[in-house]
Regions:
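Short helix- or helix-capping micro-motifs
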Residues: 37-40, 125, 149-160, 178, ...
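Membrane-proximal stem/loop segments at transmembrane-domain junctions that anchor or position
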Residues: 261, 267-352
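Membrane-interface transmembrane helices that cradle and orient dolichyl/undecaprenyl
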Residues: 143-146, 183-201, 209, 227-231, ...
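Transmembrane-helix signature of polytopic, membrane-embedded enzymes
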Residues: 115-119, 131-161, 177-178, 192, ...
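Extracytosolic helix-loop segments that constitute the early lumenal/periplasmic catalytic or substrate-binding loops
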Residues: 46-55, 60-91, 98, 105, ...
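Transmembrane-helix motifs of polytopic, lipid-linked glycan transferases
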Residues: 31, 120-144, 182-186, 382-386
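Loop-to-helix entry region of an early transmembrane alpha helix in multi-pass inner-membrane enzymes
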Residues: 93, 97-101, 109-134, 153, ...
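Membrane-interface anchor segments at the N-terminal boundary of transmembrane helices
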Residues: 115, 119-120, 324, 330-402, ...
Length: 446
């Protein structure tokens, strides 16, 4: 009897020791993955940062973040949140405030459009992308188990899109990816807690993320509803939890909404340029040709059209965007081109998930790596779909939050501009689903 008790005690002790060793191994592994990811991105930064401070007569320093860079320049030079295009102009809400504010701090400390500023901001982007390994790991751990989580984190460290869009581009991609993946990771587990501050914190974090890219707001209500459904099913305080999360979200969005109303006289939570996007990509002067690539020149953006820029400066932002709103609606009423809009939207969906728009000579001349990119993006999508199929069969409850991102988030871009840049907020979730699709079934916990 005593021998059996000793044996059980030894077994229990061994089990605790193994679990402790595994936990310690994971704690050591994640910092290693982050450091490797950062090192890879910093190597790329060394090759890209010198190309940022260039100047053309019209597109001056455009590579420094385009509209966000010009707003950051205005902030750093004392003109406030204004001037979304190269000439100094009035207040703006064309871009969300978080990343231009960060870039303005870099400009203030290291010089506007300086080589040092270019190196610093790309390094910060790279750090954000590397740290995204953390929510990727814990998101994958919740749905795939520890082994799948390790592989997903390593995959993100070496993922080409994650490297390119952080180390080579001055924009909010890496910041939004980090914040939104963290929101998603918390949303997967939110129903497990009855702590009201956790729900408040999640709502506030979603609000902060929206200040980086407001497109995430399309997915937030659905993620919240999924969590509330599980709380209600368990008999918890679902209504109070949901109300607190929404109150926190609205509280974070309200100050910038008030600022926009005072500065521009428009009621918009974050950005006011949605009708410019519709006008440029669906109506007005947009090419009425479904074969035109998404990057086609001649679209009426003030950033790339001197005529539109002069009009913007003469009319002011509010009147200019109101005109685009009126022109879009008028053109849609009188020349709706329904077939064109449907076909072009379908082509955008295909482009978003395959990278394919056209293999015409014009497109291949402008984008010589289009075939290779199509192959790569299509392979990722096929693996993602295979991962979705596996989840659907074995762990459907874990799949629903991923489906929210995959199905809801892209809708805005299906209707406007589906370039691969604007997929980066959900790219970490795509990677996790692709890992679920590529690994042998016996090696992941579904």
């Amino acid at each position: 009897m005593k021998s059996r008790e000793n044996s059980e005690a030894m077994t229990t002790s061994t089990g605790h020791t193994l679990r402790a060793e595994q936990a310690g191994s994971r704690r050591r592994l994640l910092p290693i993955i982050i450091l490797v990811a950062l090192a890879i991105r910093m190597v790329v930064v060394l090759f890209t940062f010198r190309g940022l401070p260039f100047a053309e007569e019209y597109l001056s320093h455009a590579q420094f973040g385009w509209e966000m860079g010009w707003i950051a320049r205005a902030l750093a030079s004392g003109h406030g949140f204004s001037s979304p295009y190269y000439p100094i102009s009035g207040p703006t809400a064309i871009e969300s405030p978080l990343y231009p504010g960060l870039l303005a701090v870099v400009f203030k400390l290291f010089g506007i459009y300086s080589l040092t500023s270019g190196f610093i901001i790309l390094s910060i982007n790279s750090l954000f992308s590397a740290i995204t390994c953390i929510p990727v790991y814990f998101s994958a751990k919740y749905s795939l188990g520890a082994r799948g989580a390790k592989i997903a984190a390593w995959a993100w460290a070496f993922y080409p899109f994650a490297i390119y869009f952080s180390a080579g581009r001055v924009w909010e991609y890496a910041l939004t990816g980090l914040l939104f993946t963290t929101c998603f990771c918390i949303a997967q587990r939110l129903h497990h807690t009855s702590n009201l501050f956790a729900w408040l914190g999640w709502g506030a974090l979603c609000g902060v993320t929206a200040h980086s890219n407001p497109a995430v707001l399309s997915s937030v209500p659905f993620l919240l509803l999924l969590a509330l459904y599980k709380v209600r099913k368990a008999g918890g305080r679902w209504l109070l939890n949901g109300a607190l999360a929404m109150v926190a979200l609205i509280a974070v969005l309200t100050p910038w909404t008030v600022r926009n109303y005072r500065a521009l006289g428009v009621l918009c939570p974050i950005r006011d340029n949605i009708w410019l996007e519709f006008y440029a990509d669906d109506f007005g002067n947009a090419p009425m040709d479904t074969s035109s690539p998404p990057s086609a020149e001649g679209r009426p953006y003030p950033a790339s059209s001197p005529v539109e820029l002069r009009k913007y400066l003469a009319m002011g932002e509010t009147a200019y965007l109101a005109e685009k709103h009126a022109l879009s609606l008028d053109d849609f009423r009188h020349h709706p081109h329904y077939a064109f809009l449907v076909i072009k939207t379908l082509r955008r969906i295909v482009y978003y998930w395959t990278g394919y728009w056209s293999f015409s000579a014009e497109e291949l001349q402008a984008q010589p790596f289009t075939p290779e990119n199509c192959f790569y993006v299509s392979c990722i999508t096929l693996l993602m779909l295979r991962g979705i199929r596996r989840f659907w069969r074995q762990n459907r409850a874990a799949l629903w939050p991923y489906l929210v991102l995959i199905c809801i988030f892209p809708l805005t871009y299906y209707l406007t501009k589906p370039i691969m840049d604007y997929r980066q907020a959900i790219e970490p979730a795509i990677v996790v689903l692709a890992i679920a699709g590529v690994l042998p079934w016996r090696r992941i916990k579904l």
